């Protein structure tokens, strides 16, 4: 269960873009040493949202209809392929929100801390199975609107 763990330090490296994302609990989030902040987008119609698909039939059944609903309501939907990068891109304002169901703790712990230190909201809920979560990560302005689509 998530509450049993506390992330003190988050580091995510993207070797393709040579980008290092870092944050220390209580501090500021940084990209290659420069402080980053989440976007200020406050409506779905102007937002860029990433959705992730964990490797399970249940997740696929649940997320495909959500993908269709998001596609009709947001500016753009993106599939990052990496939970850590979707979280860090949300932290830097490249994305406005990220949604995934059935993701593992080790995929989201570092990026979640980086997002929170950048002023974002990292909402997560434990699911059945060890260290598995449902999450909505956002700039702090869009979670409730995304929840209504779920």
Could you describe each region identified by the protein language model?
Residues 1-86, 134-150:
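Acidic beta-strand-loop-alpha-helix segment within the catalytic core
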Residues 106:
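Acidic donor-binding loop at a coil-to-helix junction in glycosyltransferase catalytic cores
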Residues 88-91, 112-117:
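Hydrophobic residues within well-ordered alpha-helices
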Residues 119-135, 139:
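Acidic, metal-binding active-site segment of PIN/NYN-like and related structure-specific nucleases
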Residues 92-97, 119-121:
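Alpha-to-beta junction loops
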Residues 53, 101-103, 125-127:
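Short secondary-structure boundary segments
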Residues 49, 110-111:
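Short active-site alpha-helical segment characteristic of glycosyltransferases
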Residues 97, 102, 110:
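CN hydrolase (nitrilase-like) catalytic-core segments centered on the catalytic cysteine
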């Amino acid at each position: 269960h998530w509450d049993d763990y506390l992330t003190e330090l988050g580091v995510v490296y993207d070797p393709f873009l040579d980008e290092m994302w870092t944050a220390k609990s209580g501090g500021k989030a940084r990209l290659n040493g420069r402080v980053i902040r989440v976007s200020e987008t406050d409506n779905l119609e102007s937002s860029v949202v990433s959705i992730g698909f964990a490797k399970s039939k249940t997740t696929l059944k649940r997320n495909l209809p959500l993908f269709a609903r998001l596609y009709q309501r947001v500016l753009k939907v993106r599939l990052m392929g990496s939970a850590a990068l979707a979280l860090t891109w949300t932290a830097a304002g490249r994305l406005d929100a990220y949604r995934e169901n059935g993701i593992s703790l080790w995929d989201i712990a570092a990026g979640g801390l980086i997002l929170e230190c950048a002023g974002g909201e990292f909402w997560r809920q434990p699911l059945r199975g060890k260290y598995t979560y449902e999450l909505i990560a956002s700039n702090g302005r869009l979670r409730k609107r995304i929840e209504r689509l779920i």
